[in-house]
Amino acid sequence: MYRQIDEDIILKNLDRLEEEAQMNYMSKYEPTLEEINSVYNHIKNFIRERKRIVYGGYAQNALICKQDKGKGFYKPSDLADIEFYTPDPIGDTVDLCDMLEKKGYKHIEGKEGVHNETYKIFVNFHNYCDISYMPENIFNNCPTMEAEDLKMTHPHFMLIDAYRVYNDPMTSYFRLKKTFGRFNTLMKCYPFNDNMIYNKFSYDRFKDDNKINRYIRKHIIHNSKLVVVGHYAFNQLAKMAKAPPTYMIECPFIQVISDNFEEDLKTISNKLKGNFKNIYYKRYSPFFQFLGKSVEFYHNNNLIFRMYDNNHRCTVYRYSEKKKTYFGTYMLQFMYNLIQYNMAIVRKNNFNIMVYGSMLTRMMKMRDKYLETYNMTVMDKGIFQEFTFDCIGKPVDILRESFLDTIKRREQGKHKFIYKPKGQPGKKPVFKFDNTSGEVLS
């Protein structure tokens, strides 16, 4: 249909043509670029005044541009929605809609989004922002940075979301290209502090060869479907990578992920209580969107074992035939250590900040050294292979679950939350959000 020279020139100009067409349309038709920018400015002022925390693409782009404007990934025509965290999403949705109506805008609507506990704002049929619930204990201590005079979620906290994509091949890889490109640029601007690798830490009560630690490995983990992360997995990876002896860490407790949480909890509790005295456990609520429910086992008041549920993910693993054990892949281990690192920041636990910060930097260093030594890449089969598909468990497709939930509500005569301002301050419905504080359950 086209000469090769014409095909090449068209392909070269497609991005420019799309951009010019979009800008041309918005200069003439509703909602105009002038209106859109005006609404965005009002929303940003609302976020500033209430000291809310911006996350997602808008925050990533703003933080990148703060370091180097030329590296930003949004074009003027992209009109990215602004996502922000709040401990009061319904209140903020109602108040923001009321404020925009008072400013004279039309067709204003706030309503539940696809993702649980997230609400969207539409003005003149354009989607402007996502308002997401964050438990107050996390919101008040969430690490942030400033850009555009707004509180932006810290890059290392947002990085957890990237690793949630990387470790979820079944339901999240449709986001992989966009996520990897953006976060690779973001982390070049805000890398981890390499000096954390030198952190020295010791657990006062640690005994490397203690009886209960060996029992857990041999009688609970070996030949099970539990996937090991944390200290034990870190040391196993370091040994296989032939990392320096100084990289090895004390392992006072073992961490695993379960695909059958309640049944595994019963089995493990019976085994530990049947073989050791003074055993008890504590249950914890999920930690935000990042961790599912968890349980910690204690012996003589010392933490010995922590188990997470799989948080509706198919858990990626690397199997050790020698140890008959499923270990988390490098990327899965990195994500769980990253979550614990940020949880320590939220809880102001300086010891765990030091521990997990050091584990993260050591993991990156040992990986890079190993790959250079053996002339490999992260895509090659081996202990540091990334983006793998072998996993344990049944994943949950959030979009599908949202559609099914909508159907179920409709059948029960229930409806999703929708708010349209009517000239008077709106009534804010009382809604109890799930407990995702990450704190111990009474």
Feature locations, PLM:
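Intrinsic-disorder/low-complexity loop/linker signature
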Residues: 246, 301, 322-324, 424-425, ...
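Non-catalytic nucleic-acid-binding/docking modules located in mid-to-C-terminal regions
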Residues: 106-109, 115-118, 124, 139-192, ...
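N-terminal regions immediately upstream of nucleotidyltransferase
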Residues: 1-38, 146-211, 398, 419-428, ...
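Eukaryotic intrinsically disordered, low-complexity regulatory regions enriched in Ser/Thr/Pro
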Residues: 350-358, 363-439
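Short alpha-helical segments and helix-capping/turn motifs at coil-helix boundaries
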Residues: 37-42, 106, 116-117, 210-215, ...
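Active-site nucleotide-donor binding segment shared across nucleotidyl transfer reactions
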Residues: 36-90, 212-262
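Conserved catalytic core of two-metal-ion nucleotidyltransferases
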Residues: 97-140, 270-315
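Short, conserved charged micro-motifs
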Residues: 90-97, 262-269
